């Protein structure tokens, strides 16, 4: 069996019909040690004090959706993704994600 270990599988990989299952160990939040990321997260747009926070969360959710999409590359492709990070549930409740992603999530 093929085993691929990478710190980031959200972009740059196209392995159709090759990934039966994958593990996402951690939600890929951007590094708050980066001053630009921190400034964007803390940004308030007018009276919307949480604008930057929501953008930060939406970016992380988009990375999760992209990573999960690596396991399913075609309509007839199958793959299972296990997301282990306990921070995923609160993120899932708060952040935007596409309907097709929400329809495929099953909680264990």
Predicted feature descriptions by range:
Residues 1-108:
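ASCE RecA-like P-loop NTPase motor cores
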């Amino acid at each position: 069996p093929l085993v691929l270990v990478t710190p980031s599988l959200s972009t740059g990989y196209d392995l159709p019909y090759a990934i039966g299952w994958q593990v996402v160990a951690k939600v890929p939040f951007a590094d708050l040690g980066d001053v630009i990321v921190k400034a964007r997260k803390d940004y308030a747009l007018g009276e919307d004090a949480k604008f930057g926070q929501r953008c930060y969360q939406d970016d992380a959710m988009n990375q999760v959706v992209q990573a999960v999409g690596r396991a399913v590359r075609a309509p007839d492709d199958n793959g299972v993704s296990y997301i282990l990070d306990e921070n995923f549930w609160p993120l899932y409740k708060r952040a935007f994600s596409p309907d097709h992603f929400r329809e495929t999530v099953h909680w264990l």
